[in-house]
Structures are given as structure tokens and as C-alpha cells.
Amino acid sequence: MNRSRHVTRRSALQLGVAAAALPLVHIRTAGAAGKLTVGFWDHWVPPANDAMKRQVTAWAEKNKVDVTIDFITSNGSKIQITQAAEAQAKTGHDFLPFYNWEVNTYADLLEPMDDVVKAMMDKYGQYSPIHEYLSKLKGHWRALPSSTGTLNLNCCARISLLKQHAGIDILEMYPPHKSDPKAAADWTYDNFLKAAEACQKAGFAFGLGLGQTGDSVNNTGIIYSAFGAELVNAKGEITVDSDAVNQVLDYGRKLVKFLPPDVVSYDDASNNRALISGQSALIMNPPSAWSVAKRDAPKVAEDCWTFPCPAGPKGRYNPYNLCFFGVWAFGQNKTAAKELAQYLQERPQVQERDTAANGYDLPPLVSMSDFDIWSEVEPPKGTVYNYPMRPWHDAHENITAYPAPPDIAAQMYARAIHPTMLAKVHSGQSNKEIIAWARNELEGFVR
């Protein structure tokens, strides 16, 4: 999974033409009362695009609106290029997908969505604190949380290997049905460390990266959160030299001994390869790795189970990549754009698209974590049942660098501060040296 990339003004100018050359789907309705141009992520599961197209067509015909749809690839940062080009030109789509801190980047150019968010919460319950952190800016919700494009990077492990080498029965902790939270009470970072050691000694090291790309940033960030270790607090104060941060580094010093030797150079495909090749007992990734294994290594896929990450002293955190629908304030048909955005996030539409995507997308509301698709997907049956966050998981959504102010957090995320600190542990640096390096980096962000 790739994280969002920063796009410069120059690259937007150079590549902005790409936005005009995207594949279009034009839905023309009889007696149209208005026009919309909307952009969506070009889903890696093609039937999900087909479902989106059907839903937009149904809404357009009912509301007498001409709608042009662009499915924009995430390859080459095309979504970010499109955002930057349109923000500069003040013209383009009526709404686009925005990921994580991209809402903050364009907050002043996005139409407030307070009315839509309120309507959704009145009907389906509250959004998470992380959604609010990323999207409620300067007193207003600037974008609507979306299921399409939202995913987490929970544990995906080999059932047989964890049981044989670490004595852990994953299905007992996280069965494919509602369970008692106490069943997973022992799934802690202490026991995670023991399991990592046992599996490494057996030749199946956990594929957890300490590289510079998104998976490494996300998968290390949850360790900091689980220990209550903030590098920068909500006030924007540097807090890197804390007991909690030292605890994370001490824990990392034990963990890195049991990770693959090339862990510092991991990219976003490395953990996938480790699982699919049969070399790793556990990775943290959405079901895309398991899905590829179904095709390329079916025996591996049949032995995989997705489940929440371990708990630390301050709780259990799962790494998320969050998507939002944002309506440009300079758009020509903002009311219709907001109405379409809301329609697409209502339960019936979310469920239809999730079914088409084989459960890959995650609804932003816990009340929608009960779709049948997660029970039905196989092999083995129920393998991704615990991929969405269930009420009894006793877990929290996490975005690395929270709760630092978004302007600062986005820079910390982009510079991969969290995994780099653990990579320095891997290279043998002391806590004091690592904290001094991190402080110097952070001071550049908070100025």
C-alpha cells in the first residue's frame, strides 16, 4: 500500500495535463437539471468500479443530473497531481478523493460538509476520533469519510506457523464470529515479541519493515501509540525525549533481532513477497497480499488469517489509511456534489461496493462492520472476518504521528520519522543518539 506523496507546484504544472487525459464515463440523463464531474480512485478490484458506476448512474437518473466520472489511478501519484492542479486552476472536478492529511492540505479550498456529516452520524453513529482529527479543521468538517479507499493494515498471519512455532491459536483469539474480548487479552506486544523470536528461529521471520515507505510508517506507528509515545503532542510541543519513547526504543531493540536482515530496505511490496513466498509467518497488510496468494500460492492463502494488531500498555491500535470525499468550494454544483457524496456513503451503497470489492474497503462507521462479505470470503472461510474493526476487538484506529497538529504530523509521516528511529536501533545507535537525531528533525517541522 502506498502512502500519499507530496506534490510540488512545479510537478502539478508539468503533470496537470494528466488530469485532463483521464478515462471518462459520461452519464447523460434526459432533461438534466445540472452537471457534475466527479473523480474516484481507480480500484484495484475492477468490479468495485462497476458498482460505483451503477450507483452514480442510478443517482444521476433519479436526480436529473448529468454526471461525468473519472476513475483516477493511484499509480504515479495521479490523484495527488490532480488535486494540486485543480487547486491551482480553481477548476476541475466537483469532488475528489483525499487521503489522510490531504484534507488539511486543501482545507481552505474545500466546501464545509458539516450538514452531511451530521446527517450520517444521526443515522449511523459517530465517526472515530481519527476521522475528526484528519477532517474537522478550523471548526468545520472539510470532507466526508469514505469507505472506498479506506483500509487498514492489520496482522495477516499463517495459522499453522503461529500455532506450531509460537503456540498461538489465532482462530481461538479471533474466531469468524462475535467473541469475548478476553479471548485476545494475551495478544500483547510482549507475546508478539516471543512469537517473533520463535518464528524467526524456525525460519519464518515476521515481515515488518523499517523502511521509508507507507507500510513501514504505518506498521511502526502503532507500536508508538500502544506505548503512549508521542513525538510531538497535540499542542505542537516536541515530546520525543519521554519515558514512553524510550520504552518503544527499548522494545524495538529486542524486536529487531528477530526481523529479516533486509528490514531497513523494505518497500511496500517486500512484506507481500515475504508472505506469498512462504518465508514469513506474519505481516501487517490489507487483504491484497492474501488475495495475490490465492492466485500465486493457494496453499499459503488457505493458511492465512487477518486479525487485529497486538495491545500495548496504552491499548490496541490498528494502522489505517483513510479516504475522504472532498467537494471543492469553487465547484459549480456544490449542493449536488454533496448530495451524491452522501448517497454513496449510505449503508446500501457501501455494502454493494464492499461486496463487489471482496471486502477490501472498510466503512468508516463501526455500525457498518457487519456486512456478510467478510464472513463469506475464502479460503479459508472467515479469513478476513476480523479485518474490519468490530466493537468487541477493543481496538482503536491509528494514523502515525497522531495527535501532532496535522501540518506537523504530515511532515513526520512523509519523512518516515517513526520507522527511521527503529532503523537506527537496528544499526546499533543508542537511545540518546536516536532521540537527538529525531529532535533535530522535529524542530525543523515545528518552526
Task: Specify the residue positions occupied by each region the protein language model found.
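Conserved N-terminal structural module of periplasmic/extracytoplasmic solute-binding proteins
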Residues: N2-T8, A12-A107, K118-G125, T150-L151, ...
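Short helix-initiation/N-cap motifs at beta->coil->alpha
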Residues: I72-T82, D186-N191, V263-I276
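Paired acidic/hydrophobic, glycine-rich loop segments that form the ligand-binding mouth/hinge
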Residues: D94-P97, A281-N285
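Hinge/lid segment of periplasmic solute-binding proteins
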Residues: Y99-N154, D303-P310, G382-V384
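C-terminal lobe and pocket-closing loops
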Residues: W101, S288-A301, P313-I417
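Short, solvent-exposed loop/beta-turn-alpha elements that line the ligand-binding surface or hinge
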Residues: D115-Y127, Y133, I168-A185, A229-V248, ...
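Periplasmic-binding protein-like
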Residues: N154, S225, L249, D303-G326
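Glycine-centered hinge/linker elements that transmit conformational signals in sensory
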Residues: Y189-C199, A234-S265
